[in-house]
Amino acid sequence: MNRRAVIGRLSLMLGGTIIGAEFFLSGCKSDPEKINNLFNADDLALFNEIGETILPKTATPGAKEANVGQFMALMVNDCYSPEEQKIFTNGLTKLNDRCKEQYGQDFRTINAAQRTALLTILDQEQKKEAKNNQHAVHYFRMMKELTLLGYFTSELGCTKAMRYLPVPGKYIGCIPYRKGEKSWAT
């Protein structure tokens, strides 16, 4: 065997190894869109839009800036029971279906006034269900609670929406409060 034949066969084997490995490893890639077991990046964006509709940006940052979508996904995935997770995920589907029914678009593409109107209706429905003492929690109540909890426990919520005094600070047992002032975060 001469040197040219050996080099030709080696390059063929090496090329086949590289191409074969790339083909084999292409099946090992995970879906980059997946956030956790239940939600993907589109769901996260939807959570942020729901949160921003509930707590919009004003003189203080809104829920989207506090990234409540990430908080909601984490809490539902890690802290909710399978039954509660099912209520929540089915609720997302119901929300988008209802939105498409009323406006012909999904929640993320309708305007702010339409979002507010839809969430106001859902809020009224969940209040009626709570008054009727129905056992299952309404999915919108879960979304609203998670939005508020995520926002007011975030750094932006604590430092920008409420008064914040970093610890350690001196203890003042009685602080005068005037109506309309921010409440204390700590």
Where would I find each of the regions flagged by the language model?
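N-terminal export signals
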Residues: 7-26, 111
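Structural motif
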Residues: 39-45, 62-63, 133-139
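Long, well-ordered alpha/beta core segments of mature domains
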Residues: 54, 58-67, 181
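Mature-region segments of soluble proteins
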Residues: 49, 67-186
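C-terminal segment of N-terminal export signals and the immediately downstream linker at the start
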Residues: 1-5, 21-57
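Generic alpha-helical structural element
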Residues: 36-39, 57, 61, 84, ...
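Short alpha-helical hairpin
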Residues: 23, 28, 63-69
